[in-house]
Structure formats: structure tokens, C-alpha cells
Regions:
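Short alpha-helices
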Residues: 2-72
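Hydrophobic helix-and-loop "lid/oligomerization" segment in the mid-to-C-terminal part
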Residues: 50, 55-212
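Histidine-centered active-site/metal-ligand motif
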Residues: 1-3, 179-180
Length: 212
């Protein structure tokens, strides 16, 4: 459901791009209708797909349309366990501590953009960085959030989230990443967290200048 990037696979058997779709799950379930035989979906599979929609839409808050809820309804018809899907996404105590430590480093960049970052010595997962971004975006006056953290010894990832006014996809593309308007990401190699944040601030400034 992201638009085609520079690293798009060459000569695929099937290309199905729909940037307006809320999630990959939305596209997959739609394809079921075009098959010659009925696709059997087990309740556990439907539950996992429902959880995927929760992640991609930030619990049906971002980038959703009527089709999104139609697909969710179809998964429910396939016996998706909604309560279980939410349980899949709950954090344990250690993860919660890590999220809090990153959030504690958050600072405002301009009036309505928030940048948060992890400690230089710590290794984080990309899903954790995304979760921090989703949670910080709930702050009323904040329009976009960027969360940076080291994901291995050579790479730092940035997870970007926005509401309706800031196109984080364009900002992440300036750093070699991609995504869509309200949800995007990138990774930077062989840089410190501080150097990565500096590059991010430059990309944001450039985007704001271009937007006018």
C-alpha cells in the first residue's frame, strides 16, 4: 500500500499498488474476491490480519476509509477474534520501559513537530520505534513525530508519523526511505544518533521550505 520506491522489485509477476489503501491486509483481502475458488481463512489467520490492520492504521485512527471498515467486517465474518488481536499488540514491562526512555528524550522541532531518539548504546526494534511515534502523535498540538533509534551496530532507523498536514513520506524519501503521507520510515548507515538527528532536521527544514 506504499507507492513504488527506487528499490522496487524488477519484473514481478503481479503488481498491485494502491497508496490510498490503509494497509497491506486491505489489499490482500480484496484479492480474495477475484479468485476462482473461495479462499479459506482460519480464525487465527483472520485474527492476525485484523491485528495487522490495527498496526497500519494506528487502531483505525489514520489513513482509513469506508473500505477499511468493510475489510475489517469481512475479517470478523471469518471469525477474527478482535479482543485477541488487541492482546497481540500489548507490550510487556521491558518494552514499556524502553518506550518511556525514548519518549523522555523527545523535544519540539518548531511549533508542532516532535523528534524523539533512543540512547546511542541501546539497540531497539523497528516496531518499538513505530509504537513510540504512534503514542507521541496523540499529543494534541503535535502534527508530526519522528523517532530515531539504533537497530543494529551499523544502522539507525527513523519511524515517522503524522496527522493531516505534514507529508512524512517526502521527508523520509530525502533520507533514502519511503512510505506514505502519514506513515513512513528510513534507515541511515554508519552514523551516530546525533548525526542522524542532524540529517533529519535538515530534511524537515528542506521539506518545509519547499512546501512554503
Amino acid at each position: 500500500h506504499h507507492r513504488r520506491g527506487e528499490d522496487f522489485v524488477d519484473s514481478p509477476i503481479l503488481t498491485y499498488l494502491e497508496p490510498a489503501a490503509s494497509s497491506t491486509v486491505e489489499l490482500v483481502v480484496e484479492l480474495f474476491e477475484y479468485q476462482r475458488v473461495e479462499i479459506e481463512v482460519l480464525p487465527t489467520e483472520a485474527t492476525v490480519m485484523y491485528a495487522g490492520m490495527l498496526v497500519d492504521t494506528n487502531y483505525f485512527r489514520n489513513h482509513v476509509g469506508s473500505r477499511t471498515f468493510q475489510i475489517a467486517s469481512k475479517l470478523k465474518e471469518k471469525q477474527a477474534n478482535v479482543s485477541r488481536a488487541y492482546e497481540f499488540l500489548q507490550d510487556d514491562y521491558k518494552t514499556t520501559q524502553e518506550k518511556m526512555s525514548i519518549s523522555a528524550n523527545a523535544y519540539r522541532f518548531g511549533n508542532d513537530i516532535l523528534i524523539a531518539y533512543g540512547n546511542e548504546e541501546e539497540i531497539y526494534t523497528r516496531p518499538l520505534l513505530a509504537k513510540v511515534g504512534n503514542e507521541l502523535l496523540n499529543i494534541a498540538e503535535i502534527k508530526a513525530v519522528f523517532v530515531a533509534g539504533r537497530v543494529d551496530k551499523d544502522r539507525i532507523a527513523i519511524s515517522a508519523r503524522s496527522k493531516t498536514e505534514v507529508n512524512v513520506q517526502l521527508i523520509m524519501e530525502k533520507l533514502g526511505g519511503g512510505g506514505h503521507f502519514s506513515m513512513a520510515a528510513c534507515q541511515v548507515e554508519e552514523k551516530t544518533v546525533k548525526e542522524t538527528i542532524d540529517k533529519l532536521e535538515e530534511a524537515i527544514d528542506q521539506y518545509l521550505d519547499e512546501r512554503g
